[in-house]
Amino acid sequence: DSEWDGEPIEPEPKPSPFPPRPDPWPDRVREKPAEYAKRQKIKVKLADGKARMIQHMMVTSFWHPDGTPMSAQQFMELLFGKLPEFFNDEAELRALWSLPDTRAKLLERLAEKGFGKEQMAEMQKIIDAERSDLFDVLAHVAYALPPLSREDRASKAKVEISHHFNSKQQVFLDFVLSHYVTVGVEELDQEKLTPLLRLKYHNSIADAVADLGKPEEIGQVFAGFQKYLYQPQIQANP
């Protein structure tokens, strides 16, 4: 056909009367809503002028004494205001936390004031420190120190432990530290010593004594090594 002038032009599509459906998440986010929400952080500046980053959480387990819910930021501000009643400075916090008996008394006093195990565990989540020590919660809220994972803390402490304990003691302390890393600071409680010895030595306390010395010596080793987990130089090099 001499008059043919090419393929017919398709008509332009008519615009939809409905707006385009929005992407359910931002472009860079392709994870479940709960995971995305967990990553959202907000900056909280406390009375010392230093900022802390906390997870944005819609629901927390914090409550005012009158039973009304409390936000994570309000709880952090309350804890920050109360901590000077328990220790005067960072050095005193480290000293109290470095021994099982004084640490237990500190935790007991905190619980009496409304800062119990459940609340402290919740605060661990909020500052994204679930793999850290409860010490890190207190040090972060009180002094804005960056949390350090239990694994890193244990790894750095082993250097000091190798200089202060014999080989058999080091083997046992490595075993203790593995439980500390996996479970938490409660594995360093004094009442956990005997269960840990039984676990390590297959229920034979006699074997433990043969390796580690008299019971009082074992107790001193167990309590004495813990200060190396909380030295300032460990925190200074996260």
Report each predicted region and the residues it spans.
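Acidic/histidine-rich catalytic neighborhood
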Residues: 6, 10
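Catalytic cores and motor modules of nucleic-acid processing enzymes
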Residues: 12-238
